[in-house]
Regions:
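AAA+ P-loop NTPase catalytic core and its hallmark functional loops
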Residues: 1-198, 202, 261-268
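C-terminal engagement/docking regions of AAA+ P-loop ATPases
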Residues: 54, 237-268
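Alpha-helix initiation and N-capping motif
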Residues: 69, 179, 234-238, 256
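Conserved AAA+ ATPase small/helical "lid" subdomain
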Residues: 183, 190-248
């Protein structure tokens, strides 16, 4: 076994509950070697979905958390200087292309546009990655796939993908699960009882209803899970909700008070 491949494999099945036909669609996209774009709010399950699909498809997964300081060299690689001279070190995108991994660029709109254009040759019929500094063109492994994600709610004129980038991908829309399904996910993920899980989800729904009315983003499923984990460790439900589900999403005193009242009503 190639240790470079094995270190990126998902050892155990990640828990993921499909919301629709996204699993079947991704399997078809992978079979066709199509790049995939996942769109949805923060903490709705995009990253967990990618982990699950990597496990289901039996492929290694290399994840890159994109940020505004990321350069093209951070993705493709660079020369390093050591006591033996200079040596080339592949970046995560190049490594994935060589070994046939799924490369997941998380929150790609956070990266500069002049950085993300390096993925273009990998996302059309060429499936190649030019390493200009090395004078090499890497032909992607037949099993390689590129997956990107971003939150459309954070789009702006300054942070958005170019149309020339968007039109290279098959796109899946994600959102927070329906309340019953979300409660099931929270209970399965944490071991919390079904009644408490349902109450936590009800609070999350109340926060999401404030999006656009003082909140830029509602409470994510991830934060609901955090609250459940605190409750399981002996924290009172109201305190757990304030700590994990309200305080992280707003500093506005009026909105905090509104959500604190919702907590008191739900956990009366």
């Amino acid at each position: 076994m190639n240790p470079d491949i094995e270190q990126y494999r998902i050892a155990r099945e990640p828990f993921y509950r499909p919301q629709g036909d996204e699993v079947v669609l991704h399997e078809a996209a992978y079979a066709a070697r199509l790049p995939v774009m996942l769109k949805g709010p923060t903490g709705c399950g995009k990253s967990r979905f990618v982990e699950y699909m990597a496990w289901k498809l039996g492929r290694p997964l290399i994840t890159v958390a994109c940020n505004e300081d990321m350069t093209a060299s951070d993705l493709v690689g660079r020369y390093l200087l050591d006591r033996d001279g200079t040596r080339w070190l592949d970046g995560p995108l190049t490594t994935a292309a060589r070994i046939g991994a799924i490369c997941y660029l998380d929150e790609i709109v956070e990266a500069r546009q002049d950085t993300t254009v390096v993925i273009h040759p990998l996302t059309d019929h060429r499936r190649t990655l030019p390493l200009d500094k090395k004078g090499e063109v890497v032909a992607a492994h037949p099993d390689f796939q590129l997956v990107i994600s971003y939150n459309p709610g954070y789009q702006s004129l300054m942070k958005d993908l170019k149309p020339s980038t968007k039109q290279r991908f098959a796109a899946f829309d994600f959102d927070y699960p329906e309340p019953a399904l979300e409660a099931e996910i929270v209970a399965r993920e944490t071991g919390i009882d079904a009644d408490t899980a349902a109450r936590l989800v009800k609070l999350a729904q109340a926060a999401r209803n404030l999006k656009g009315h003082g909140l830029s983003e509602g409470t994510s499923t991830r934060l609901v899970v955090y609250a459940a984990q605190l409750i399981l460790r002996g924290i009172a439900p109201r305190a757990a909700c304030r700590t994990a589900m309200v305080r992280p999403i707003t500093d506005d005193a009026d909105i905090r008070e509104t959500l604190d009242h919702a907590i008191d009503a739900i956990f009366a």
